[in-house]
C-alpha cells in the first residue's frame, strides 16, 4: 500500500504541548501550517459541527494534545491489556474502519505528546508483574502510520527494549518501517 506523506492543512493544539519535547518538535516540523490553540483535544467545536460530507477534509487536520487519562483495559484475546498510547484516529481513509462510523468524534489523527509518562506506566506495570505481560499499544490508531509523523516507533522500541516481563504489540496494515 502506498501512502503519501501526511501534510496537515491545519493543526489544532493544546497550549500545554509546548512543555514537551515531542510537542516542540511537531510545532517546529509544521511551523508553516496554520494553527489554532484549543482547550481540549476531545472537544473541538469547529470539528464537531462539520457535516458528513466533510469527512475527508476533516482528516487533513492534525490534533495535538496531552493524554489526560491512561487506563489499561484488560484484554485476553491478543494481549493482557489494551493501552491508549501516543495517538488516536488515523490519516488514512479505509472504508471498512470502525472510525468512519464515529468520524466527527475521533477519525482525524490526534497525537499525544506525553509519551514518556505513558510508556513509564507500561514499564512499571511490567516490572511489577510475576509473569510476562503483553500490552497492545495500537488499538486506537496505527503506530506505523503515526510514526511517519512522530518517529514514535523507534523511540518506543529504544525506551522499552530492556523491560523485563513486558511485550508490546500493535496491529497495522502499513509497511513503512526501516
Predicted region positions:
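Gly/Ser/Thr-rich loops at beta-strand to alpha-helix junctions
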Residues: 16-19, 89, 176
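Flexible, acidic/Gly-rich N-terminal and inter-domain linker regions that tether
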Residues: 1-80
